[in-house]
Amino acid sequence: MYIRFILFLFFISSCDFPERNCLKFQTGTFEFKSISEKGDTLITKFTRTKDLEIGFFNEKIDSNTVKWVSDCECIYKKVNPKSLSEKKAVQMKILSTNANSYTFEYSFVGDIKNKQRGFVKKISD
């Protein structure tokens, strides 16, 4: 019985769980890169406080309220939506972190079939 317990502890301790130090990524200035349909690299920079995110893309500014529902998950709502689709809230969940970046998934709230993933690099605090 004692041997089984030791083996169980060894098995559990050898599992490699992804690092999730989400609190350090709730605020700061970040950079998000994506690829357009034409193959161009698109760069979005954004600054996030505990309750507001301001993004800069193609010389346009976009603002969202941020509500953290856990250390690693938040809900975004556009400050001044101009269309029905912009009124939809977006759910974002940090999946893993490392020293200065994180991997995340996002979708409209309640839309579990259309989740997408991304990678963000933290530029400054």
Give a label for each model feature.
Residues 1-8:
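Sec-dependent signal peptide recognition
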Residues 11-14:
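C-terminal motif of bacterial Sec signal peptides marking the signal peptidase cleavage site
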Residues 16-18:
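Bacterial signal peptide processing site
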Residues 22-38:
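Tryptophan-anchored aromatic micro-motifs
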Residues 40-69:
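N-terminal glycine/threonine-rich, aromatic-flanked beta-hairpin/loop signature
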Residues 55, 103-117:
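Short, exposed beta-strand-loop hairpins at the edges of beta-sheets
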Residues 65-73, 94-101, 122-125:
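A short, structured loop/turn motif at beta-sheet edges
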Residues 75-99:
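An anionic, turn-rich surface loop/hairpin at beta-sheet edges
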